[in-house]
Amino acid sequence: MDFKKTILWAVFSLSGLMLYNNWQVHEGKPSMFGGAPATTASAPNKSGAPAKLDTPVAISGIPSVTQTPTANSAPVESTQKFVLENELLSVEISAAGANVVDAKLLKELTADQKPVEIFQHTPTHTYVARSGLVAVGNTDLPNHTSLFKLDRSGKDGSGRPFLVLSSERNGVKLEKTFLLNPGSYDIYVGHRVTQVTPNGAPLILYTEIVRDGSEEKKIGPFGGAFSASTFTGPAIYTDGGKYKKVSFADIEKNKFTAPSQIAAGQPGWVAMVQHYFASAWIPDDKLPRDIYSGKIDNDLYRVGMQTQLGTIATGTTVMANAQLFVGPQEERMLETIAPGLELLKDYGYLTILAKPIFWLLEHIHNIVGNWGWSIILLTVLIKLAFFPLSAASYKSMARMKEVQPRLAAMKEQYKGEPQKLNQAMMEMYRKEKINPLGGCLPVVIQIPVFISLYWVLLSSVEMRGAPWILWIHDLSVPDPYYILPVVMAVSMFVQTKLNPTPPDPVQAKVMMYMPIVFSIMFFFFPAGLVLYWVTNNLLSIAQQWQINRLFGKKPAK
C-alpha cells in the first residue's frame, strides 16, 4: 500500500471539499458540516409595480408603525428625480422620500461598456437607500414615502454639487442635504430636523438600505454549479461585535439577532454587499444608534440603523449627519472612509494570510503595471518562499519512485497477505531511510496559502476588467477560449507522470483522471485564478524534474 499517495489524495480531496464549503458559507448558505439547508428565496414581485416601501419597526420601546399614503405622499414612479454627479459617481434622488434610487459607477463598466448600476428601482429590481423619521403615536412624519420639495441646489464654494430637499408633516420638518465630494464614492447626507410646533414625542431617524434577494447570474452549465460563488446580502459592523454578514435566508427565518444599542462615540455601520461592490450607511457616531434588519415584502429585505434624536424642543433644530458609500470594494479607499469598512472586501476565514498576500500583490503591480504579470511574479515569490518545503516533498517522491520496482515485487511476493506486505514495506522504508509521509507535510502547510490567494484573486475588484496579454482582456472572468484551463490540465497530467505510480490500480486511475475533473471546474473560474494555478504547476514541474535529475532518475513516460 502506498501510504504517502493515499494521504496526499486524502489531503487534496479534503482541501477541495473545504474550498467548496467555503464558497457555500461565503455565499450565505449553511455549511455542509452543520445547520439546516437554506430556504429558497421567494419569487420577486412581478406585478409590474415596485414593491411596497413601509416604514421600519421602531426600536427602543417605540412600537411598530405602518405608513399609509397621505396628501403629502406620492408614488415613487411618478415623481421627479434630481441628479448629483462627479467624475466617479452619478446618483438620482427621488422627490418621493428623498431616497437614493439610482447610482451609476462611471469608471466601472459592464461587458457592454455601460456604467455599473448599484442602486436601482424598477418593476423587476429594487435596491435603494432611504431615510426618514418615526415617533411614538405619530406615524405621519416626514419619511421615505413623503413628498419632498427642492429648496436649493447647485455647487458650494468648493465646487461640490449639492441639493437640499425638505418635507414637513405634523409639526416636524426634515431637510435632507446631499453633497458629493470630487473624486469620491462617498455621499454626505445631512438630516436637519426642526420641531415647528409642540410635540412631546421623542424622534428617531432611520437610515436603511432596501434590496431584493436577487443575486448575480452564475456562469457555466448546471446553473453555474462550477463557477466561483460570492456573498450577496446585508453586512453590519460595530466596535463590539465587529463585522458580520447576514444572509437573506437568516432574515427570512428571523434567525439574525441585531447587536444591542451602539453607544454614542462608538463606530458602526450597515451595508449591502455584492461581488466587487457595496453600499453602506455610516451615521454620525455622536448619538446612540440601533441596528435592525427585516423582511419587508415578498423577496424584499432591509438593513438599517435608527439614531435616537430624543425630544426636540419647539423651535429648535437637531442635526444628524451620515455618509452613504456607493462604490467598489477597493481596500485602501475603504480604510479612509470609516473604521472597519475595509472588511467589506471579504477574504474568508484566512484574512490574516490574505491581507499580506494582497499587500504584496499590490506592490508588485505598482512596479510592473499589469495585474496578470503581477499574479505570475507573486506565484514565483510564493514558490521561492516554500522552496525548502517543496524540495523535501519532491525528494521524498523521488526516493519513492526509486523503490517502485521493489514495491511491485513485494506486492507479487505477498499476494493475498496484506499484513506481511505492510511489514515488509515498513522494513524496506526503515532500511532505505524513507518516510512514506515525508511528502505530505509540505503540501498541508501550503494549502492555507493557496486558499488565501484564491480569495484574494476572487474578491479583488482590481482584477475586474484588468487585461493580461493577447486574448485575456479581463482577469475576473473565465478565459473566453479556455486556453488556460487546457494548459492547466496538461500541466497536471505531466505532474502525475513525474510522480511515482501508485501500486494500487484504482488509485492510479484516480490520479490519472484527476486533471480532467479539476479542468472541468477551472473552465469556469476567473482567468486570474487559473493563471496562478498554471504558473504554480509549471514551476512545480520544473522543480520536480530537476530534483528527479539530481537523483539520477528520468521522469516516467
From Swiss-Prot:
Checking InterPro entries in the record gives: Membr_insert_YidC, Membr_insert_YidC_N, YidC/ALB3/OXA1/COX18, YidC/Oxa/ALB_C, YidC_ALB_C, YidC_periplasmic_sf
Does the keyword section mention Cell inner membrane? yes
Question: Which terms under GO biological process does the entry name?
Answer: protein insertion into membrane; protein transport
Identify the keywords attached in UniProt to this record, alphabetized. Answer: Cell inner membrane, Cell membrane, Chaperone, Membrane, Protein transport, Transmembrane, Transmembrane helix, Transport
Membrane topology, as annotated: Multi-pass membrane protein
Span-the-membrane segments of this chain are: 6-26, 219-239, 367-387, 437-457, 514-534
Its chief place of residence is membrane
Q: Name one GO molecular function term.
A: membrane insertase activity
Where does it live in the cell?
Cell inner membrane
Gene Ontology CC:
plasma membrane
The superkingdom of the source organism is: Bacteria
Quaternary state and partners of this protein?
A: Interacts with the Sec translocase complex via SecD. Specifically interacts with transmembrane segments of nascent integral membrane proteins during membrane integration.
Q: Which protein family is it in?
A: Belongs to the OXA1/ALB3/YidC family. Type 1 subfamily.
What does this protein do, in the record's words? Required for the insertion and/or proper folding and/or complex formation of integral membrane proteins into the membrane. Involved in integration of membrane proteins that insert both dependently and independently of the Sec translocase complex, as well as at least some lipoproteins. Aids folding of multispanning membrane proteins.
Q: What is this protein called?
A: Membrane protein insertase YidC
Highest classification ranks of the organism: Bacteria, Pseudomonadati, Pseudomonadota, Betaproteobacteria, Burkholderiales
Q: Which gene encodes it?
A: yidC
